């Protein structure tokens, strides 16, 4: 395949914000963690938002988290979105804290060492969202430790997740641009297969579990059986 022009690569990358630890672009979200805390003052004014990684910072109570947010907002551009990141095993605490602090996005990290599968994380997140985030002010997200496919994105969005961030499978910016375009095409193919025109039209009813184990932990309708397994009605 012929190489993309630098401008075309730039345009693709600019349409996709990244979560970064350093050197943020104007569209990027700067992660705030123990590793880069000393360099936040230089980097944050350039970023399009910031994410507080609760899993990689010392424990904080509500007042301490408020204090950190005030300090970070004083360094950031006006009215940038704020994200909280926490382990999926603590998703209820994450959502409760996000609601209390009026956070824009509550993002759960899937690979947190707890052993919870993606399939079991979906109903857990859905129940917590319904309990703690029913005002609609805070969006929910997943932070994946692997490169998501178009199919992965379709499943997550159909499950009610608003934002997905995942690891890029390569470091070169041009390769990342190609990968983003390919993932977008994969997602478009998934939408056509389901018969919807927009990712916003995807719903849980479009999902099917292809095996008994996935149906058991996710509550999805089992393909062929066309309803959730009986224990989900107990």
PLM feature spans:
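Conserved N-terminal/central alpha/beta ligand/cofactor-binding core
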Residues: 177-178, 189, 193
